[in-house]
Amino acid sequence: MSNSFTLPLRPARQKANREDDLAVKIAQINAQKGSFRDVTEASLLAEIEAARAVGDGEAEAVDVKTGEDEEENREEKLFKSRLEISQFAMNAHMEATYALEFVSLLLSKHAPRQAETSMSPLLKQKVPLGSLGADHIKPPEQSETQKRDVDAVSRGWKLESFDAAANKLLQSAQRLEEDIAAETKYWSEVLKIKEKGWKVCRLPQERQTLGVHFGFLESTQNFRDRGLAALRKGEAGRLILDRGIQLKPPRFVRVRVQRGDQTLGLTIPAISKQLDDQCLDGRIREARDSLYEEELFYELNREARVLLQYGVEIRRDLLKFPADDNKHIFVDLVGLDEALPDIGGLDPLDNLLAEGVAKSFRILLSYAHRKNHHRRTRVPPPVTPNKRPAPEYNIIRPLLCYFQHRSHYQWFTSFFGTLSKTLRSAGLKCSYTLYPLMKRPQSRAGSSQQTLTVSSVERLIDTLINPSESIISCNLISQGSVFRVRITTNVNPNGLGSEFELVTNLAHFPAQQSPFRFGLREDVRDLIIHLFTLDLVYLVPSLVKGSASAGASQYLISRYTGSQAFVEEESTDENEFAPSPAAKQDDVYLLPWQPTFPQQGELTAYSPARCRTKKLQIQLQSDQLQLRCFWVRHRGPSTKADEQPGERLFTWRAVDMLGGAEESSRPTLQRVMELLGEKYDDQTVQNIGSK
């Protein structure tokens, strides 16, 4: 038995009961072609060729007409179709009205009152009631030939009707099959979109149309409403993403790093343009990314308006803020088709910096959306007539805080590096330890259970938006003397900036007041140089060996240590120099050095052999250390030797550590102090360290 069963829609052709006789055929030929005398072979061939030509012409005319119909505008077809439908409706209404008038007038002869209710006023006025009647008549009898003709005509009409019905059924079946295939393809693509995680819903304005939501629910209202697009069915069931009439080309936020007019770093587009229209998921992602970039630039502009006092500039569609002392960050919104410069000639580090800034922008905007979600899911505050403010998102502030903090940290790192090289060139030990970017924990309001619900990602971002802190711990030259510099940069809009805190622990000043807080890094630098100068002043007496007895040296050092260093001015002589001890004045050429004015870096030493006082001045900068030693003029009767001050100058520079010279070839501070304590030190001016 066959598996398929076919049901023919067209009726079976039946042969005629009998063929027409010869007389009938001859009569038909005479009626169509004329007399047989005019029929020749040439005329028949000519007639056949003419029929062929007419057939080809009709085919070409049909093709031309079909092409012209295809070129017609769809709108014109729509108007024509609507006009035809209106005309058909009017004709049907008129024909129905005429039929009603006819039947009413016909019935008015037998039931005038009932028929009068369905007659129009014009018909009542023009035609009297009962003027139209109908009677049954006996139809005339038909001959056998007429009956056969009527049966043949009826059978022909039936066959033609069945054939037309079969064609319409087959066309309907084909159209239904195409519609089923289109619907299957449409819903399969909708299902693919749903399976990929996109939210499919009905459009608010068109409930019968499906749409896909690719926006962000926590965005502002302008961008939240634009995050919904219709999923319309195109040709052959192809899915079309309809975003409305305000469609813009995809754009992205571009970040550039510039020094002056020179571009050092540049970001690549965060979204890629979809050239393949068949990839619907790619086009949805492109629409989502483009909308996200537009919202990001909008929020950056909002925040930049309140940060103008912190160096942020707005130039039409361009944002600018400083990255360090020499570089600036430029942010703008550009299209994907805009020509980009060749990034091959740019600095890779600056490219990474630009990429980091762009990604930080996007992460902080997503974090702002997360905070909006938490705020929306919490218990709402009491209803008030005042409109709740919409504060700006913290997107630029954390980066400003980071760049400012990094600039200060690098500046102090360079300062301590140069200062340590300067001291090492003089043979002194100076070490410092760096603790960069230590994030202070921010206290959270709420119970411990609420704190535990915070995800690790949010805790990570909290460290980014909290104040930044770095610590530099440095050991002074003297043993046990240390200080610590704390650099703190706040993100709070009411106090955005850096604060410097200096905590000291000096062996020579156990009762010092600390910490010291500053707002300028130059003030911190001056205080650090001052601390090193004080440390050097009290270190110099311990560097000299063999110039005096251990007891006298210990006595002098302890005398000027601690708080007594600033209160023993009454023991000085009229030359404002401390008197030298009288012990062993005949044997000692130069007594130990005494800090006379430690705040100014001055020391003095008395020479019993020459009855004069020698002064030593210490001048410390970050890149050089300078010692200036000379005799103080005596007020009594001068000799020829006293007229020559015997000034000597010693300099150590940080660049000496980069010259490649060995440390043994450079005189140290201890060696210089030993030379200054010898009897033959009165030589011409020297400059140690400069080559």
Curated annotation (Swiss-Prot):
Keywords on record: Activator, Coiled coil, Nucleus, Transcription, Transcription regulation
Gene Ontology terms: biological process: regulation of transcription by RNA polymerase II
InterPro entries in the record: Mediator_Med17
Disulfide bonds: none
Ranges in coiled-coil conformation: 158-185
Pfam family, one: Med17
Family annotation (PANTHER family): MEDIATOR OF RNA POLYMERASE II TRANSCRIPTION SUBUNIT 17 (PTHR13114:SF7)
Function of the protein: Component of the Mediator complex, a coactivator involved in the regulated transcription of nearly all RNA polymerase II-dependent genes. Mediator functions as a bridge to convey information from gene-specific regulatory proteins to the basal RNA polymerase II transcription machinery. Mediator is recruited to promoters by direct interactions with regulatory proteins and serves as a scaffold for the assembly of a functional preinitiation complex with RNA polymerase II and the general transcription factors.
Name listed for the protein in its UniProt record: Mediator of RNA polymerase II transcription subunit 17
Native source species: Coccidioides immitis (strain RS) (Valley fever fungus)
Gene this chain is encoded by: SRB4
